[in-house]
């Protein structure tokens, strides 16, 4: 069995990826995938200009798959089941992360200073805050029915 949680969004060549995943499975092996999706439109995360901070700092090189995108790559893995979940729960999660980082600002700043350096920690603290707010807004949009969470179960 293979389980992937929120990783496939950072990939683009799904045909090659699914072939590789299939090669790791025994015959009859299962692959469970949890991903974020847009209801109908896949789109790439590519930096378009200096203001495109989410593509640059959080999803560089990745893509937002559409809900049906994984179904087009069944050469090596066959879909057994698919589930779609409202984005409302992820909206709640992103808002909880925002509250948590605000309540633990000193601890967060310490970690961010270690990772990004003292000169960049404040900037990264704000980037993370805006990221959480943006995610909450996206996944809550249209009552959670535009950007969603999708689960897929494939079999080799």
Role assignments for model-derived ranges:
Residues 3:
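A conserved beta-strand element that flanks and buttresses the S-adenosyl-L-methionine
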Residues 6:
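Short catalytic micro-motifs in class I SAM-dependent methyltransferases
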Residues 9-10:
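A short His-aromatic
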Residues 13-14, 93:
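Residues at alpha-helix caps and immediate loop-helix transition turns in enzyme cores, especially N-
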Residues 15-30:
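A short glycine-rich, Lys/Arg-flanked "PGG" loop and its adjoining helix->strand segment in the class I
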Residues 34:
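Alpha/beta-hydrolase-fold catalytic nucleophile elbow
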Residues 37-149, 155-156:
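Substrate-binding/catalytic lobe of Class I Rossmann-like enzymes that use SAM or dcSAM, i.e.
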